[in-house]
């Protein structure tokens, strides 16, 4: 009986560890580390002037249709292999985790991600400069 209880405890602990590892690997933070940190850095400060900070004023991006469209189409977002739901969670996590301004924004949706994936961005620096020129 003791062996059975011990074996059950060991198996339960192993399954718990495996499931928590699987959850961790699908978290928005994990996706950020895989697909965004190379350009935007661990703390979201980016590599100005070419790669913008995620900590600075993103209001022009999260607050306008053109800006949201831009965020949905940047190479790291459009190229992320996760589901549309996971990518929407990633974008929302980025805004909530790094942006230091007003967080009154409409969360990104999986439907927006799917639309963004239909139109890949070929020159993100050029498109960002064009977008900023309009503000």
Label for each model-derived stretch:
Residues 85, 96-135:
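Flexible coil segments in periplasmic/lumen-exposed cytochrome c-class electron-transfer proteins
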Residues 32-42, 90:
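The canonical Cys-X-X-Cys-His
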Residues 16-31, 42, 47:
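Electrostatic cytochrome c docking/interface patches
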Residues 65-105:
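Mid-chain, structured segments of secreted extracytoplasmic proteins
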Residues 29, 45-80:
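Gly/Gly-Pro-rich "capping" loops immediately C-terminal to redox-active cysteine motifs
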Residues 40-43, 58, 74-78, 94-98, ...:
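Sec/Tat-exported extracytoplasmic proteins
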Residues 1-4:
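Positively charged n-region of N-terminal signal peptides that target proteins for export
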Residues 7-17:
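Bacterial N-terminal signal peptides
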């Amino acid at each position: 009986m003791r062996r059975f209880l011990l074996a059950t405890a060991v198996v339960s602990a192993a399954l718990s560890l495996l499931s928590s590892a699987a959850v961790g690997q699908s978290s928005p933070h994990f996706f950020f580390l895989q697909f965004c940190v190379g350009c935007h850095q661990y703390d979201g400060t980016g590599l100005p002037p070419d790669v913008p900070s995620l900590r600075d004023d993103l209001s022009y991006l999260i607050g306008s249709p053109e800006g949201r469209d831009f965020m949905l189409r940047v190479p790291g977002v459009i190229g992320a292999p996760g589901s549309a739901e996971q990518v929407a969670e990633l974008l929302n996590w980025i805004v909530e985790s790094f942006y230091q301004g007003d967080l009154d924004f409409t969360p990104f949706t999986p439907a927006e991600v799917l639309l963004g994936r239909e139109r890949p961005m070929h020159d993100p620096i050029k498109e960002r400069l064009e977008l900023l020129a309009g503000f």
